[in-house]
């Protein structure tokens, strides 16, 4: 691998009113190991931001910190601020369950519940005691339409979610996440288990979703990052190296390490 100046950085910022989420001096530790090294970063509203970098660079760890998923790891410790709507999501007194209604997550592999398609969508509402069938029906239809799945499943809503294809299951998981009307949707390599056609359909769904949501996606697929995102951030060994409009990252990167990574020269 070529010698790089790892102190070189190029990180764009946005006016505060355009930012859906901001991290300030965010560190993540696994025991004594520092996995994320003091990242300052903003995410623009109603845009898709891709997080890229070689395996082990910290991009998924960073993504998981944004809605406190690292809380489930005993040895994980997160310091710094995660600012959403003027509130520090990383504060100890935050109701994490309520916060995740605003900052949702779609995981790497489709993980539908062992329930019907309908019950997957209504799960959070029914858990909260909502019984209004008309309201629940509307939530199901709206969420499935936004996830581009309604036309395929509208006559099979009470069949098991496991009868769906992998791509359909992933879009069901997106519908389940957006059913509670989050403002931000986190996606951790959502297409990694999908075939090319299902991946294309997922990306088309993302383009529609960004009209209403801010999307942050981790991907190992450079072509996907180039196609599907407005902004791209390059991570390396826990550091944010470069963050810019996607066209700039792929065609005119300011840091040599970024240019070499996206062109396949290392990583």
Curated annotation (Swiss-Prot):
<dbReference type="GO" id="GO:0005524">
    <property type="term" value="F:ATP binding"/>
</dbReference>
<dbReference type="InterPro" id="IPR005670">
    <property type="entry name" value="PstB-like"/>
</dbReference>
<keyword id="KW-0547">Nucleotide-binding</keyword>
<dbReference type="GO" id="GO:0015415">
    <property type="term" value="F:ATPase-coupled phosphate ion transmembrane transporter activity"/>
</dbReference>
<keyword id="KW-0472">Membrane</keyword>
<keyword id="KW-0067">ATP-binding</keyword>
<dbReference type="InterPro" id="IPR027417">
    <property type="entry name" value="P-loop_NTPase"/>
</dbReference>
<dbReference type="GO" id="GO:0016887">
    <property type="term" value="F:ATP hydrolysis activity"/>
</dbReference>
<dbReference type="InterPro" id="IPR003439">
    <property type="entry name" value="ABC_transporter-like_ATP-bd"/>
</dbReference>
<feature type="binding site">
    <location>
        <begin position="53"/>
        <end position="60"/>
    </location>
    <ligand>
        <name>ATP</name>
    </ligand>
</feature>
<comment type="subunit">
    <text>The complex is composed of two ATP-binding proteins (PstB), two transmembrane proteins (PstC and PstA) and a solute-binding protein (PstS).</text>
</comment>
<dbReference type="InterPro" id="IPR017871">
    <property type="entry name" value="ABC_transporter-like_CS"/>
</dbReference>
<keyword id="KW-0813">Transport</keyword>
<dbReference type="GO" id="GO:0005886">
    <property type="term" value="C:plasma membrane"/>
</dbReference>
<feature type="domain" description="ABC transporter">
    <location>
        <begin position="21"/>
        <end position="262"/>
    </location>
</feature>
<keyword id="KW-1278">Translocase</keyword>
<keyword id="KW-0592">Phosphate transport</keyword>
<protein>
    <recommendedName>
        <fullName>Phosphate import ATP-binding protein PstB 2</fullName>
        <ecNumber>7.3.2.1</ecNumber>
    </recommendedName>
</protein>
<comment type="similarity">
    <text>Belongs to the ABC transporter superfamily. Phosphate importer (TC 3.A.1.7) family.</text>
</comment>
<dbReference type="GO" id="GO:0035435">
    <property type="term" value="P:phosphate ion transmembrane transport"/>
</dbReference>
<comment type="function">
    <text>Part of the ABC transporter complex PstSACB involved in phosphate import. Responsible for energy coupling to the transport system.</text>
</comment>
<dbReference type="InterPro" id="IPR003593">
    <property type="entry name" value="AAA+_ATPase"/>
</dbReference>
<keyword id="KW-1003">Cell membrane</keyword>
<dbReference type="Pfam" id="PF00005">
    <property type="entry name" value="ABC_tran"/>
</dbReference>
